[in-house]
Amino acid sequence: MLPMSVHPATTPALASRPRVSLPRPSTPSSSSSLVHLKSRRPPLRSLRSLTAAAAAAAVEAGEPYFGLGDDEPLGGEGDAEAVVESEEYKVEVPEKQDPMLVLKFIWMEKNIGIALDQMVPGVGSIPLSPYYFWPRKDAWEELRAKLEEKEWISQKQMIILLNQATDIINLWQQGGGSLST
């Protein structure tokens, strides 16, 4: 006999207790507990149909019915259509906004930097070009070359963006680099 083993004959306290054991399923306990948990909880569809049935019964009996989150009684004053309307859910989807091409600029005392970005609603700004600096290099020509590389930019958009870049460069030249004038 090993010193760590316990036998009912040698320990009277253990021998006098009856042992009750529950039958164990043949499947692993983790999967059976998951199935058991799932079977306890009715699906949401069942809850909605139970709520609708309780509301309809309250309307027929003329009793006030307070559903989940409702502030006003539906029974007595309303009809069965009110119950059906409360079950309808409406989802409003905002209008799809198209991405926009924008010019960003850095206004400095001796330089002005111009870059092309794409603004995507809900996402933010996506840079399409690095900053091109004037008068260090010809920023307008570099921007035009970058716009021509992007085949998906229309000719009209390209002209508008280049005109805006011209206006910004001219404004910077007139002000001498300072924004206070």
Curated annotation (Swiss-Prot):
GO terms for molecular function: structural constituent of ribosome. The keyword Nuclease does not apply. Residues 1-40 are annotated as: Disordered. The keyword rRNA-binding does not apply. Its main location: plastid. One of its GO terms (biological process) is translation. Residues 14-36 have a biased composition (Low complexity). It is found in: Plastid, Chloroplast. Coiled coil: none annotated. Keywords: Chloroplast, Plastid, Ribonucleoprotein, Ribosomal protein, Transit peptide. One of its GO terms (cellular component) is ribosome. Pfam families: PSRP-3_Ycf65. InterPro entries: PSRP-3/Ycf65_sf, Ribosomal_PSRP3/Ycf65. Belongs to the chloroplast-specific ribosomal protein cS23 family. PANTHER family: 30S RIBOSOMAL PROTEIN 3, CHLOROPLASTIC, OS04G0461100 PROTEIN. Component of the chloroplast ribosome (chloro-ribosome), a dedicated translation machinery responsible for the synthesis of chloroplast genome-encoded proteins, including proteins of the transcription and translation machinery and components of the photosynthetic apparatus. Part of the 30S ribosomal subunit. This is Small ribosomal subunit protein cS23. It comes from Hordeum vulgare (Barley).
